[in-house]
Amino acid sequence: MNGQLADTIQLKIADGLAALPPPFTRRDVHLPAIPGKALAVIGMRRAGKTYFLWQCLADRLAAGEPRATLLYFNFEDERLAEMQAGDLQHLLEGYFRLHPEWRDRRRVTFFCDEIQVVPGWETFIRRLLDSEQIDIFVSGSSARLLSREVATSMRGRALEVLVHPFSLREALRHAGAEPAQPLAALPKAGRSALEKALRDYLILGGFPEAQGAVERDRGALLRSYVDVAMLRDVIERHQVSNPTALRWLLRHLLSNPAAPFSVQKFYDALRSQGIAVAKDTIHAYLTHLEDTFLIRAVGLHTSSARQRMVNPRKAYPVDPGLIQIYERSGRANLGHALETAVLIELERRGADVGYVRTPDGYEVDFHAQLPDESRWLMQVCATAAAADTLERETRALVAAAPLYPEATPLLLTLDLTPPAQALPAPLRWQSAAAWLLGEPLPA
C-alpha cells in the first residue's frame, strides 16, 4: 500500500467515527438477529440503502453503544480507486490504532458502504467475522452486490436485507403525514386525506428523491434510475451483446405491468420488427432485470415445477411510480399500480408469492404465504362499487377458495367503505389503504 492511500484510509476512519447520522426517514425493514453473520443491505439503486445504514448506526447509538464503536466507511471515493483486497487490512488496523483498548474486549460495528468496489472484499469480511469481535453491515450497488452472489461469495456468512423504495406508510412518514390512528378511527377529513395520499403514492411511487418532485422532473429522475440500472447493472456487467433487444424487453415489461409475459410471444414480436435474438437470451435478460430489482416476476402457484416453467410469469416494476412514465396511453392506471404496490408490500413482509389459475380459467392475482404461516388469496382492483365489477372481481376468488381452504380469500380495493353488496362467504374485503398500512382485517 502506498503511503497516500494509507493516509486517506486513516483520515476517512476518523471522519467516519466523528460524523453524525444525517436526517433520515425511518424504514420499516426487518433485520435478522443471528450472531456471527454479516448483514448485506441490497436493493434497487436510489432506494435508500445508505440512509438505512445510518438508521442502523443511529439505532445502536440510541441503545447506548459509544459512538466510537460504530464506524461508517464509504468506499466510493476516487482517492480509493486503486484499493485492493490486501489494503483492507489497514481499515482494521487503522481503527484499532485509535482504540486499542477495545480489541478482543468488546464488540464494535463496521458499516461498509459500497465495499463492492474493492476486488476480493468478501475474503476480508469473512476473516473479520472469524477472527475479530466485529458486527458487519455491507451495502452496495446491485451491479456487484446481488443476493445470490452474496450467498455464494460469503459462503453462508452473510444474510441479505432487502431495502425497497418507500412503502405507503414510509412515504406518509417522510411527508410528516403518517396516521397515528387506524383508518376507521380517523375523522372524515383524515380519511379523505389518506385516500388522496394513496392515489398520489400510486402515481408518484416510493423512491425517496421523487417525493415532492414536480411531474416533469420526477419522470426524468425515474427514467435516469432505469437507464443507469440497465446500463451499469445489466449491459456493462453482463457484456450484453444485443442492447436493442434488452431495451425492448424492459420497455415492454414496464409498460405492461401485471400482464403475463411469454418469451415465445415476445420473441415473435422482436422477429417481426427485424430484431434477431435467441429465446435463451431473452430468458437471461429477464433474469438480469430481476437481479437489478427493476422487475419482480411472479410465477404460477403450484407444487409442480414443470407447471411453473411452462406457464407465463407476470412481471411488475419494483415501484408503482415507474408505471406512469412508461404507460403508453399516458393515463394513470391505478388498478395496475395498486396491484404492484400490493406485491411489493408482500415482498417487504417476507411473503412467498404466486398467482392462481383455477381449472375454469379464472385468475387470482396473488397467493401469499407469510412468515407466520398464514396464507392469503388476494384479488386487487381499483374499485368494486359497481355490481358488475364486484361480480367480475369476486368470481375468481369464489372459484379458488375451495381449492385453498387454508387461505383467507381477500378483496382489496381503493374504496374506503366495503361494497354495498355483501360478499359471498368466505370472502373478505379490506380497504387497500388499511392493508398497505398493516392494519388487521376488520371484524
Residue ranges and their predicted role:
Residues 1-30:
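N-terminal pre-Walker A segment at the start of P-loop NTPase domains
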Residues 2-6, 13-14, 149-260:
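Interdomain motor-coupling "hinge/lid" segment immediately C-terminal to the ATP-binding subdomain
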Residues 3, 69, 215-374:
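Accessory nucleic acid-recognition modules appended to NTPase machines
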Residues 41:
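Hydrophobic anchor at the beta1->P-loop junction of P-loop NTPases
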Residues 49:
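Conserved lysine of the Walker
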Residues 52:
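Hydrophobic positions on the alpha1 helix immediately C-terminal to the Walker A/P-loop
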Residues 414-443:
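Domain-level recognition of nuclease-like catalytic cores that cleave nucleotide substrates
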